[in-house]
Amino acid sequence: MYFGLSEEQESIQDFVKKFLADNASVDEIRKIANGEGEELEKNIFDGILNLGINTLLIPEEHNGLGAGLLHAVAVAQALGAGVGPIPFVGSYVMAPIAINLGGSEEQKNNYLPKIASNELRFGIGMSEFVGAREDAGIEFSKNKLNGRALFVLDAENSDFIILANKSGNIFLINAKDKGVKINKLTTVDKTRSFHEILLENVNAEILALTEDNNEIAKK
């Protein structure tokens, strides 16, 4: 039995590696990490999206490729090897999985095609579910979220943010809501963005609030 990547997956991986080798040198990545290459970072991001990585986990009926997680793994490996400063895991892996598994048909129709067309970017915060902290937590009541979420991935420049609470309930909020405050956290890897999200009476959509929500959050 063969346990390696398929020819298609290797091809996608090679495209990403080649793009980064041609467009993201160590010096350029260093500038981005030091906050000196905003336009450069945008150009790299736009170029990577032209390879279609944002469509991998979007079902075909929502204008995506309908590929599997191994395709995403292949891309993630290539981005890691090239130190690509791309918000891939939040917007284009975890968000599509959460919406596809936990969203209503209306939510799927509204969000998934816009991820595929790069109209929307998502931040995602699952840290409260996988490792809650005493000084943080979110509470949901009357369709509102309040509280503090830590280590939210890819929240910077996102349009929406997906958050999980301690029970594994998953919620979706507009990042531009007046009750949302986003603070960047300092981490070791400056090519990745993690944030603290402060929430005050923020309108929230329920993405998964069922007896099976734990399974969706785990995935």
Where are these regions (language model features)?
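N-terminal glycine-rich flavin-associated loop
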Residues: G84-E105
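Glycine-rich beta->alpha junctions and the first turn(s) of the following alpha-helix
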Residues: Y2-E8, I12, A81, K181-K219
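A generic, well-ordered mixed alpha/beta core segment in the N-terminal half of proteins
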Residues: L101-R121, L145
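Amphipathic, small/basic residue-rich leader segments at the start of a protein or domain
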Residues: M1-V89, N110, K114
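A short core secondary-structure module
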Residues: G125, R148-K181, L185
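A short, Trp-centered hydrophobic/proline-enriched beta-strand micro-motif
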Residues: S117-F129, L163
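Long, well-ordered alpha-helical segments
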Residues: V16-V26, E105-Q107, K142-L145, G168-G179, ...
